[in-house]
Amino acid sequence: MQDLIAKAKQQAQQAELYQITVTETPVRYENNKLKGIDASSRQINALRIVKDGKLGFATSTGDNLQPLLDMAAATAQFGRDWDLPLPGPAALPQVQLTHPSTVLDTDTLVEMGEKLVRRLAKCHPDLLASADVSARQTTTKLINSQGFAGEYSKSIFSILGGAELTEGKNFLSLYAGYFSGKREDQLEKTIESLVSNYEHGRTNVPVKSGKYTVIFTPQGLGDIINPLLECANGLAVEKGFSPWKDKLGEKLFAEEISLFDDATISFAPASCLFDGEGIPAQRTAIIEKGVINNFILNMVTAKALGLKSTGNGFRSKNGELSSPGNSNVVLEINGTQPLEQLLGSVKQGIIIDSLMGAWAGNPYSGQVNGNIALGFLVEDGRIKGRVKDCMVSVNVFEAFRHQIEGASAEKEWAWNMLAPHLKLSDISISAKG
Protein backbone atom coordinates (compact mmCIF):
# COMPACT_ATOMS: atom_id res chain seq x y z
CA MET A 1 0.00 0.00 0.00
CA GLN A 2 2.83 2.39 0.82
CA ASP A 3 4.43 1.74 -2.57
CA LEU A 4 1.25 2.70 -4.41
CA ILE A 5 0.90 5.92 -2.40
CA ALA A 6 4.53 6.77 -3.18
CA LYS A 7 3.93 6.27 -6.90
CA ALA A 8 0.71 8.27 -6.76
CA LYS A 9 2.51 11.22 -5.15
CA GLN A 10 4.76 11.44 -8.21
CA GLN A 11 1.81 12.52 -10.37
CA ALA A 12 -0.83 13.75 -7.91
CA GLN A 13 -0.93 16.28 -5.09
CA GLN A 14 -2.77 13.94 -2.71
CA ALA A 15 -3.53 10.23 -2.62
CA GLU A 16 -5.44 7.85 -0.39
CA LEU A 17 -5.78 4.06 -0.50
CA TYR A 18 -8.63 2.34 1.30
CA GLN A 19 -8.76 -1.44 1.61
CA ILE A 20 -11.26 -3.75 3.27
CA THR A 21 -11.08 -7.53 3.48
CA VAL A 22 -14.21 -9.43 4.48
CA THR A 23 -14.53 -13.11 5.36
CA GLU A 24 -18.03 -14.34 6.09
CA THR A 25 -19.83 -17.61 6.71
CA PRO A 26 -23.62 -17.22 6.53
CA VAL A 27 -25.86 -20.19 7.30
CA ARG A 28 -29.44 -19.92 6.05
CA TYR A 29 -32.58 -21.83 6.96
CA GLU A 30 -35.87 -21.46 5.10
CA ASN A 31 -39.18 -23.23 5.69
CA ASN A 32 -37.71 -25.17 8.64
CA LYS A 33 -34.86 -26.60 6.55
CA LEU A 34 -31.21 -25.80 5.91
CA LYS A 35 -31.11 -23.73 2.73
CA GLY A 36 -27.42 -23.13 2.25
CA ILE A 37 -23.97 -22.32 3.59
CA ASP A 38 -22.25 -19.61 1.57
CA ALA A 39 -18.74 -18.99 2.87
CA SER A 40 -17.05 -16.12 1.05
CA SER A 41 -14.02 -13.87 1.17
CA ARG A 42 -13.42 -10.64 -0.74
CA GLN A 43 -11.04 -7.73 -0.82
CA ILE A 44 -11.99 -4.26 -2.04
CA ASN A 45 -9.40 -1.60 -2.86
CA ALA A 46 -10.27 2.05 -3.47
CA LEU A 47 -7.80 4.73 -4.55
CA ARG A 48 -8.59 8.43 -4.35
CA ILE A 49 -6.19 10.99 -5.81
CA VAL A 50 -6.24 14.75 -6.21
CA LYS A 51 -4.56 15.81 -9.45
CA ASP A 52 -4.51 19.42 -10.62
CA GLY A 53 -7.34 20.21 -8.21
CA LYS A 54 -9.56 17.43 -9.59
CA LEU A 55 -10.67 14.26 -7.83
CA GLY A 56 -9.83 10.90 -9.38
CA PHE A 57 -11.18 7.63 -8.05
CA ALA A 58 -11.00 3.92 -8.89
CA THR A 59 -11.76 0.60 -7.24
CA SER A 60 -10.58 -2.96 -7.73
CA THR A 61 -10.78 -6.37 -6.12
CA GLY A 62 -8.01 -8.76 -5.15
CA ASP A 63 -4.33 -8.15 -4.45
CA ASN A 64 -3.25 -6.45 -7.67
CA LEU A 65 -3.15 -2.73 -6.85
CA GLN A 66 -1.10 -1.45 -9.77
CA PRO A 67 -3.94 -0.79 -12.28
CA LEU A 68 -5.66 1.45 -9.72
CA LEU A 69 -3.35 4.40 -10.25
CA ASP A 70 -3.83 4.52 -14.01
CA MET A 71 -7.60 4.23 -13.64
CA ALA A 72 -7.80 6.93 -10.97
CA ALA A 73 -5.60 9.27 -13.01
CA ALA A 74 -7.81 8.75 -16.06
CA THR A 75 -10.93 9.74 -14.13
CA ALA A 76 -9.33 12.81 -12.56
CA GLN A 77 -9.62 14.89 -15.72
CA PHE A 78 -13.39 14.51 -15.47
CA GLY A 79 -13.57 14.61 -11.67
CA ARG A 80 -15.08 17.16 -9.34
CA ASP A 81 -13.07 20.06 -7.98
CA TRP A 82 -11.30 19.18 -4.73
CA ASP A 83 -9.51 21.57 -2.40
CA LEU A 84 -9.74 19.68 0.90
CA PRO A 85 -6.57 18.38 2.58
CA LEU A 86 -6.79 14.71 3.46
CA PRO A 87 -6.47 13.91 7.20
CA GLY A 88 -3.02 13.64 8.72
CA PRO A 89 -1.90 11.41 11.61
CA ALA A 90 -4.35 11.31 14.52
CA ALA A 91 -4.86 9.54 17.84
CA LEU A 92 -7.48 6.83 17.48
CA PRO A 93 -9.96 5.82 20.20
CA GLN A 94 -9.57 2.66 22.25
CA VAL A 95 -12.47 0.47 21.15
CA GLN A 96 -12.73 -3.31 21.42
CA LEU A 97 -13.87 -4.66 18.07
CA THR A 98 -13.01 -8.37 18.24
CA HIS A 99 -13.89 -11.09 20.71
CA PRO A 100 -13.05 -14.82 20.73
CA SER A 101 -16.75 -15.70 21.13
CA THR A 102 -17.47 -14.55 17.57
CA VAL A 103 -14.93 -16.90 15.99
CA LEU A 104 -17.31 -19.71 15.09
CA ASP A 105 -16.90 -22.72 12.86
CA THR A 106 -19.56 -23.77 10.38
CA ASP A 107 -20.84 -26.66 12.51
CA THR A 108 -21.55 -24.30 15.41
CA LEU A 109 -23.44 -21.88 13.15
CA VAL A 110 -25.50 -24.76 11.75
CA GLU A 111 -26.31 -25.99 15.25
CA MET A 112 -27.49 -22.54 16.30
CA GLY A 113 -29.72 -22.16 13.25
CA GLU A 114 -31.11 -25.64 13.80
CA LYS A 115 -31.89 -24.89 17.45
CA LEU A 116 -33.77 -21.72 16.54
CA VAL A 117 -35.79 -23.34 13.76
CA ARG A 118 -36.67 -26.44 15.80
CA ARG A 119 -37.86 -24.38 18.74
CA LEU A 120 -40.10 -22.23 16.55
CA ALA A 121 -41.45 -25.23 14.69
CA LYS A 122 -42.71 -26.63 18.00
CA CYS A 123 -45.11 -23.69 18.31
CA HIS A 124 -47.41 -24.92 15.55
CA PRO A 125 -47.23 -27.75 12.98
CA ASP A 126 -47.88 -25.32 10.10
CA LEU A 127 -45.43 -22.64 11.19
CA LEU A 128 -42.58 -21.97 8.75
CA ALA A 129 -39.39 -20.85 10.46
CA SER A 130 -36.31 -19.21 8.98
CA ALA A 131 -32.89 -18.32 10.32
CA ASP A 132 -29.75 -16.53 9.20
CA VAL A 133 -26.71 -17.09 11.38
CA SER A 134 -23.40 -15.58 10.38
CA ALA A 135 -19.86 -14.95 11.57
CA ARG A 136 -18.02 -12.14 9.79
CA GLN A 137 -14.47 -10.88 10.13
CA THR A 138 -13.26 -7.68 8.48
CA THR A 139 -9.93 -5.92 8.29
CA THR A 140 -9.94 -2.26 7.27
CA LYS A 141 -6.84 -0.34 6.23
CA LEU A 142 -6.43 3.27 5.16
CA ILE A 143 -3.28 5.12 4.24
CA ASN A 144 -2.79 8.51 2.61
CA SER A 145 -0.11 10.90 1.42
CA GLN A 146 -0.66 13.23 4.40
CA GLY A 147 0.72 10.69 6.87
CA PHE A 148 -2.41 8.94 8.06
CA ALA A 149 -2.03 5.17 8.39
CA GLY A 150 -4.69 3.19 10.21
CA GLU A 151 -5.79 -0.41 10.46
CA TYR A 152 -8.28 -2.37 12.54
CA SER A 153 -9.92 -5.78 12.57
CA LYS A 154 -13.51 -6.38 13.56
CA SER A 155 -15.69 -9.43 14.11
CA ILE A 156 -19.47 -9.54 14.04
CA PHE A 157 -21.84 -12.33 15.01
CA SER A 158 -25.36 -11.99 13.67
CA ILE A 159 -28.51 -14.00 14.14
CA LEU A 160 -31.86 -13.30 12.51
CA GLY A 161 -34.93 -15.42 13.06
CA GLY A 162 -38.32 -15.35 11.40
CA ALA A 163 -41.62 -17.20 11.52
CA GLU A 164 -44.71 -17.23 9.34
CA LEU A 165 -48.06 -18.85 10.04
CA THR A 166 -51.16 -18.82 7.86
CA GLU A 167 -54.46 -19.89 9.39
CA GLY A 168 -57.35 -19.28 7.04
CA LYS A 169 -57.31 -15.55 6.25
CA ASN A 170 -55.04 -14.80 9.19
CA PHE A 171 -51.35 -14.32 8.40
CA LEU A 172 -48.82 -13.87 11.19
CA SER A 173 -45.27 -12.82 10.33
CA LEU A 174 -42.54 -12.38 12.96
CA TYR A 175 -38.87 -11.51 12.95
CA ALA A 176 -36.17 -10.71 15.47
CA GLY A 177 -32.41 -10.67 15.61
CA TYR A 178 -29.14 -9.17 16.76
CA PHE A 179 -25.79 -8.01 15.41
CA SER A 180 -22.94 -7.89 17.90
CA GLY A 181 -19.18 -8.02 18.22
CA LYS A 182 -19.54 -10.31 21.23
CA ARG A 183 -21.62 -13.47 21.41
CA GLU A 184 -23.57 -13.75 24.63
CA ASP A 185 -27.21 -14.84 24.86
CA GLN A 186 -28.44 -13.46 21.52
CA LEU A 187 -29.70 -16.85 20.34
CA GLU A 188 -31.79 -17.33 23.46
CA LYS A 189 -33.12 -13.76 23.30
CA THR A 190 -34.10 -14.16 19.66
CA ILE A 191 -35.99 -17.37 20.40
CA GLU A 192 -37.65 -15.82 23.46
CA SER A 193 -38.79 -12.77 21.50
CA LEU A 194 -40.20 -14.79 18.61
CA VAL A 195 -42.01 -17.30 20.83
CA SER A 196 -43.48 -14.54 23.02
CA ASN A 197 -44.72 -12.59 20.00
CA TYR A 198 -46.15 -15.78 18.52
CA GLU A 199 -48.08 -16.54 21.70
CA HIS A 200 -49.47 -13.01 21.94
CA GLY A 201 -50.08 -12.83 18.20
CA ARG A 202 -52.24 -15.93 17.84
CA THR A 203 -55.28 -14.09 19.21
CA ASN A 204 -56.63 -11.19 17.16
CA VAL A 205 -58.49 -8.50 19.07
CA PRO A 206 -60.63 -5.66 17.69
CA VAL A 207 -59.58 -2.06 18.10
CA LYS A 208 -61.38 1.17 17.29
CA SER A 209 -59.91 4.22 15.60
CA GLY A 210 -58.80 6.91 18.02
CA LYS A 211 -55.99 8.34 20.10
CA TYR A 212 -54.00 5.81 22.11
CA THR A 213 -51.07 5.55 24.44
CA VAL A 214 -48.46 3.67 22.41
CA ILE A 215 -45.35 1.86 23.56
CA PHE A 216 -42.82 1.47 20.77
CA THR A 217 -40.39 -1.40 21.29
CA PRO A 218 -36.73 -0.78 20.41
CA GLN A 219 -37.34 -2.66 17.18
CA GLY A 220 -40.46 -0.63 16.46
CA LEU A 221 -38.65 2.66 17.10
CA GLY A 222 -36.56 2.42 13.94
CA ASP A 223 -39.13 4.12 11.72
CA ILE A 224 -39.90 6.70 14.43
CA ILE A 225 -36.27 7.73 14.90
CA ASN A 226 -35.53 7.78 11.16
CA PRO A 227 -36.83 11.34 10.51
CA LEU A 228 -34.49 12.66 13.20
CA LEU A 229 -31.52 10.90 11.61
CA GLU A 230 -32.46 12.09 8.13
CA CYS A 231 -32.77 15.68 9.32
CA ALA A 232 -29.37 15.45 11.01
CA ASN A 233 -27.64 14.01 7.93
CA GLY A 234 -25.07 16.49 6.67
CA LEU A 235 -25.98 15.97 3.03
CA ALA A 236 -29.63 16.86 3.70
CA VAL A 237 -28.52 19.89 5.68
CA GLU A 238 -26.11 21.01 2.94
CA LYS A 239 -28.73 20.62 0.20
CA GLY A 240 -31.35 22.45 2.24
CA PHE A 241 -33.73 19.50 2.56
CA SER A 242 -33.42 19.41 6.34
CA PRO A 243 -35.52 21.84 8.39
CA TRP A 244 -32.66 21.90 10.93
CA LYS A 245 -30.18 23.75 8.72
CA ASP A 246 -30.25 26.93 10.79
CA LYS A 247 -31.31 25.31 14.07
CA LEU A 248 -28.01 24.41 15.74
CA GLY A 249 -28.22 25.35 19.40
CA GLU A 250 -32.01 25.61 19.38
CA LYS A 251 -34.21 23.58 21.69
CA LEU A 252 -36.69 21.81 19.42
CA PHE A 253 -37.63 18.87 21.64
CA ALA A 254 -38.44 17.99 25.22
CA GLU A 255 -35.55 18.11 27.65
CA GLU A 256 -35.96 14.39 28.32
CA ILE A 257 -34.60 13.35 24.93
CA SER A 258 -31.00 12.98 23.82
CA LEU A 259 -29.84 11.25 20.64
CA PHE A 260 -26.25 10.23 19.97
CA ASP A 261 -24.22 8.70 17.19
CA ASP A 262 -21.45 6.71 18.85
CA ALA A 263 -18.88 4.66 16.95
CA THR A 264 -16.79 4.10 20.10
CA ILE A 265 -18.94 1.50 21.91
CA SER A 266 -16.94 -1.70 22.33
CA PHE A 267 -18.41 -4.71 20.50
CA ALA A 268 -21.31 -2.67 19.09
CA PRO A 269 -22.36 -3.53 15.52
CA ALA A 270 -21.31 -0.28 13.83
CA SER A 271 -18.25 0.68 15.87
CA CYS A 272 -14.89 1.46 14.28
CA LEU A 273 -11.61 3.26 14.95
CA PHE A 274 -11.87 5.67 12.02
CA ASP A 275 -14.30 6.36 9.21
CA GLY A 276 -13.80 5.80 5.49
CA GLU A 277 -11.77 9.01 5.21
CA GLY A 278 -9.40 8.58 8.15
CA ILE A 279 -11.26 10.76 10.66
CA PRO A 280 -11.13 9.20 14.17
CA ALA A 281 -14.36 7.65 15.42
CA GLN A 282 -16.21 9.63 18.06
CA ARG A 283 -19.42 10.06 20.05
CA THR A 284 -21.55 12.84 18.58
CA ALA A 285 -24.50 14.39 20.37
CA ILE A 286 -27.10 15.02 17.67
CA ILE A 287 -29.73 16.09 20.20
CA GLU A 288 -28.79 16.80 23.81
CA LYS A 289 -31.56 17.50 26.30
CA GLY A 290 -33.81 18.55 23.46
CA VAL A 291 -31.27 20.88 21.82
CA ILE A 292 -29.98 20.36 18.27
CA ASN A 293 -26.29 19.99 18.98
CA ASN A 294 -24.62 18.68 15.80
CA PHE A 295 -25.08 17.09 12.41
CA ILE A 296 -23.72 13.85 10.96
CA LEU A 297 -20.86 14.95 8.71
CA ASN A 298 -18.17 13.69 6.41
CA MET A 299 -15.37 15.94 5.14
CA VAL A 300 -17.27 17.42 2.20
CA THR A 301 -20.47 18.29 4.06
CA ALA A 302 -18.49 19.59 7.03
CA LYS A 303 -16.62 22.05 4.84
CA ALA A 304 -19.79 23.15 3.06
CA LEU A 305 -21.39 23.96 6.42
CA GLY A 306 -18.31 25.48 8.02
CA LEU A 307 -18.11 22.71 10.61
CA LYS A 308 -15.78 19.82 11.48
CA SER A 309 -16.27 16.27 10.27
CA THR A 310 -17.85 14.07 12.93
CA GLY A 311 -16.11 10.95 11.61
CA ASN A 312 -19.22 9.74 9.80
CA GLY A 313 -17.83 9.48 6.27
CA PHE A 314 -18.74 5.87 5.60
CA ARG A 315 -18.32 3.87 2.42
CA SER A 316 -20.54 1.27 0.82
CA LYS A 317 -19.52 -2.37 0.78
CA ASN A 318 -17.91 -1.75 -2.63
CA GLY A 319 -15.58 0.90 -1.24
CA GLU A 320 -17.16 3.84 -3.04
CA LEU A 321 -16.51 7.44 -1.98
CA SER A 322 -17.87 8.24 1.44
CA SER A 323 -21.13 9.93 2.29
CA PRO A 324 -22.51 10.93 5.70
CA GLY A 325 -24.01 7.96 7.53
CA ASN A 326 -24.74 6.76 11.03
CA SER A 327 -22.72 4.37 13.13
CA ASN A 328 -24.38 3.23 16.38
CA VAL A 329 -27.46 5.26 17.25
CA VAL A 330 -28.17 5.70 20.97
CA LEU A 331 -31.50 7.06 22.22
CA GLU A 332 -31.57 8.27 25.82
CA ILE A 333 -34.74 9.31 27.64
CA ASN A 334 -34.71 10.75 31.17
CA GLY A 335 -37.24 9.48 33.69
CA THR A 336 -37.18 5.74 33.12
CA GLN A 337 -38.85 2.90 34.98
CA PRO A 338 -38.72 -0.90 34.73
CA LEU A 339 -40.46 -2.21 31.61
CA GLU A 340 -42.96 -4.17 33.68
CA GLN A 341 -44.03 -0.96 35.43
CA LEU A 342 -44.13 0.97 32.16
CA LEU A 343 -46.46 -1.63 30.67
CA GLY A 344 -48.49 -1.84 33.87
CA SER A 345 -49.18 1.89 33.73
CA VAL A 346 -51.10 1.56 30.44
CA LYS A 347 -54.86 1.43 30.96
CA GLN A 348 -55.62 1.12 27.27
CA GLY A 349 -52.95 1.32 24.63
CA ILE A 350 -51.00 -0.42 21.92
CA ILE A 351 -47.52 -1.90 21.70
CA ILE A 352 -45.93 -1.48 18.28
CA ASP A 353 -43.08 -3.83 17.41
CA SER A 354 -42.86 -3.21 13.66
CA LEU A 355 -44.38 -1.07 10.94
CA MET A 356 -44.80 -1.61 7.22
CA GLY A 357 -44.51 1.10 4.59
CA ALA A 358 -43.53 3.86 7.01
CA TRP A 359 -40.37 4.59 5.01
CA ALA A 360 -42.38 5.84 2.03
CA GLY A 361 -43.14 9.32 3.37
CA ASN A 362 -41.15 12.55 3.50
CA PRO A 363 -38.81 12.19 6.50
CA TYR A 364 -38.07 15.92 6.66
CA SER A 365 -41.68 16.66 7.60
CA GLY A 366 -41.40 14.44 10.66
CA GLN A 367 -44.60 12.66 9.69
CA VAL A 368 -44.59 8.86 9.96
CA ASN A 369 -47.57 6.89 8.65
CA GLY A 370 -47.51 3.13 8.37
CA ASN A 371 -49.41 -0.09 8.74
CA ILE A 372 -48.86 -1.85 12.04
CA ALA A 373 -47.14 -5.05 10.92
CA LEU A 374 -46.95 -6.38 14.47
CA GLY A 375 -48.74 -4.72 17.36
CA PHE A 376 -50.66 -5.70 20.47
CA LEU A 377 -53.58 -4.25 22.40
CA VAL A 378 -52.90 -3.52 26.08
CA GLU A 379 -55.66 -3.17 28.67
CA ASP A 380 -55.01 -2.59 32.36
CA GLY A 381 -51.34 -3.36 31.87
CA ARG A 382 -51.91 -6.72 30.17
CA ILE A 383 -51.43 -7.75 26.55
CA LYS A 384 -54.79 -8.91 25.20
CA GLY A 385 -53.83 -9.94 21.69
CA ARG A 386 -52.72 -8.80 18.26
CA VAL A 387 -54.19 -5.80 16.44
CA LYS A 388 -54.72 -6.19 12.70
CA ASP A 389 -55.58 -3.92 9.77
CA CYS A 390 -54.49 -0.79 11.62
CA MET A 391 -52.43 2.25 10.71
CA VAL A 392 -50.47 4.56 12.97
CA SER A 393 -49.89 8.23 12.28
CA VAL A 394 -47.42 10.24 14.31
CA ASN A 395 -45.56 13.48 13.81
CA VAL A 396 -42.21 12.70 15.35
CA PHE A 397 -41.31 16.34 15.91
CA GLU A 398 -44.49 16.91 17.93
CA ALA A 399 -44.25 13.57 19.71
CA PHE A 400 -40.73 14.26 20.97
CA ARG A 401 -41.75 17.76 21.97
CA HIS A 402 -44.99 17.13 23.87
CA GLN A 403 -45.97 13.44 23.97
CA ILE A 404 -43.23 11.56 25.83
CA GLU A 405 -44.77 9.78 28.82
CA GLY A 406 -41.91 7.55 29.83
CA ALA A 407 -39.36 4.96 28.83
CA SER A 408 -38.10 1.64 30.11
CA ALA A 409 -34.93 1.45 32.16
CA GLU A 410 -33.98 -1.58 30.07
CA LYS A 411 -32.35 -0.85 26.71
CA GLU A 412 -32.02 -3.25 23.81
CA TRP A 413 -30.10 -3.32 20.57
CA ALA A 414 -32.24 -3.25 17.43
CA TRP A 415 -29.80 -3.59 14.55
CA ASN A 416 -27.43 -0.60 15.07
CA MET A 417 -29.65 1.29 17.53
CA LEU A 418 -29.60 1.05 21.33
CA ALA A 419 -32.91 2.24 22.72
CA PRO A 420 -35.48 1.74 25.47
CA HIS A 421 -39.15 0.98 25.06
CA LEU A 422 -40.71 4.41 24.54
CA LYS A 423 -44.17 5.42 25.75
CA LEU A 424 -45.95 8.19 23.82
CA SER A 425 -49.39 9.67 24.44
CA ASP A 426 -52.21 10.62 22.06
CA ILE A 427 -51.01 8.69 19.02
CA SER A 428 -53.51 8.36 16.18
CA ILE A 429 -54.57 4.83 15.29
CA SER A 430 -56.85 4.15 12.32
CA ALA A 431 -58.62 0.80 12.26
CA LYS A 432 -60.24 -0.81 9.24
CA GLY A 433 -64.01 -0.70 9.41
Task: Show which residues each predicted segment covers.
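Short beta-strand elements
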Residues: 38-51, 150-177, 286-288, 372-380
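Short acidic, glycine/serine/threonine-rich loops at helix termini
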Residues: 27-32, 138-155, 169-177, 224-230, ...
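Acidic low-complexity segments
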Residues: 6, 12-19, 23-24, 66-152, ...
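Structured beta-strand/loop patches that form or line metal/cofactor-binding pockets in enzymes
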Residues: 10, 14-44, 128-149, 347-371
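Internal metal/ion-chelating core segments
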Residues: 152-252
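N-terminal alpha-helical targeting/anchoring segments
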Residues: 27-77
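Dual-mode signal for accessory low-complexity, basic/Gly-rich regions
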Residues: 11, 247-433
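A generic local secondary-structure boundary/capping motif
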Residues: 5-7, 34-38, 107, 116-123, ...
